[in-house]
Amino acid sequence: MGIARILSAVLFLSVLFVVTFPTLLSADHHDGRIDTCRLPSDRGRCKASFERWYFNGTTCAKFVYGGYGGNDNRFPTEKACMKRCAKA
């Protein structure tokens, strides 16, 4: 009876994996990473004042970056932001 439980658990976990795996590959993920352009702007943890650009879901907008931390939705120029995030 012990082997039957183990096989049942393996079968259950296999089915669970097959059902949830497509969700991991949804539109919010590209090449295994979260789509940068969907992240919110994030000033970071420091108090410097660098002008940067982020994609707000529609277009690229300026924000002040503190110089450390934050996320990858941060570009040095509007052109770089549009190149990465604007839909063709």
From Swiss-Prot:
Listed as disulfide-bonded, the cysteine pairs are: 37-85, 60-81
Q: Which domain of life is it from?
A: Eukaryota
Tissue-specificity statement: Expressed by the venom gland.
User: What GO terms are given for molecular function?
Assistant: potassium channel regulator activity; serine-type endopeptidase inhibitor activity; toxin activity
In Swiss-Prot or TrEMBL terms, this protein is called Kunitz-type U15-theraphotoxin-Hhn1m
Which residues does the record annotate as propeptide? 28-33
Organism annotation: Cyriopagopus hainanus (Chinese bird spider)
Question: What is the similarity comment for this entry?
Answer: Belongs to the venom Kunitz-type family. 01 (intermediate) subfamily.
Q: What does this protein do?
A: Serine protease inhibitor that inhibits trypsin at a molar ratio of 1:1.
The record's principal subcellular location, in a coarse class, is secreted
InterPro entries per the UniProt record, alphabetical:
Kunitz_BPTI, Kunitz_BPTI_sf
User: What processes in GO biological process is this protein linked to?
Assistant: envenomation resulting in negative regulation of voltage-gated potassium channel activity in another organism
Show the Gene3D superfamilies listed in the entry.
Pancreatic trypsin inhibitor Kunitz domain
SMART domains per the UniProt record, alphabetical:
KU
PANTHER family documented for this protein: KUNITZ-TYPE PROTEASE INHIBITOR 2 (PTHR47247:SF1)
